[in-house]
């Protein structure tokens, strides 16, 4: 009888340990996926900032340097309207221009978290900024859509007012 009780207790303890181990491993996978998502977004943000810093007033003014030879500073600055401004030029260049940056990809995650990148222009009255929004499904349970947002003022925009 004592052996039977000891066996039942041992089974209960081992079952509990197995459950905790399973939950810990699942949590670890979610953490790895979250780290991969955040790293992918951070890498993409750095590439966008690098692309912005490559668009300079000097490069826009020089038609023979191999950079932005089909664009000039006047075109880059635009007319200051919602559809023609420095931020929209930056958005076009990052999307499919000479300094284009591909959307982030998740190659190391085991699940598709539908990571998306969207651009929009923010009107600040006399100037405009580029808003870059990343959207993805959180890897943890009970976590819905998450967003990461950055706002960029084009680095060459100061040259538009000279």
Language-model-detected regions and their locations in the chain:
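Low-complexity, Gly/Pro-rich coil/beta segments used as flexible assembly/activation regions
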Residues: 42-162
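Aliphatic-rich helix starts adjacent to a transmembrane/signal segment
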Residues: 1-45
């Amino acid at each position: 009888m004592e052996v039977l009780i000891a066996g039942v207790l041992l089974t209960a303890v081992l079952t509990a340990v197995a459950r905790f181990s399973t939950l810990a491993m699942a949590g670890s996978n979610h953490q790895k996926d979250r780290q991969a998502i955040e790293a992918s977004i951070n890498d993409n943000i750095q590439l966008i900032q690098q692309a912005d810093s490559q668009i300079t007033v000097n490069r826009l003014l020089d038609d023979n340097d191999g950079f932005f030879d089909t664009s000039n500073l006047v075109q880059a600055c635009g007319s200051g309207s919602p559809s023609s401004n420095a931020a929209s030029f930056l958005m076009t260049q990052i999307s499919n221009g000479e300094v284009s940056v591909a959307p982030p990809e998740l190659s190391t995650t085991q699940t598709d978290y539908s990571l998306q990148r969207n651009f929009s222009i923010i009107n600040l009255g006399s100037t405009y900024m580029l808003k870059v929004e990343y959207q993805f499904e959180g890897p943890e349970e009970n976590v819905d859509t998450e967003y990461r947002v950055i706002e960029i003022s084009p680095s060459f925009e100061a040259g538009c007012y000279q």
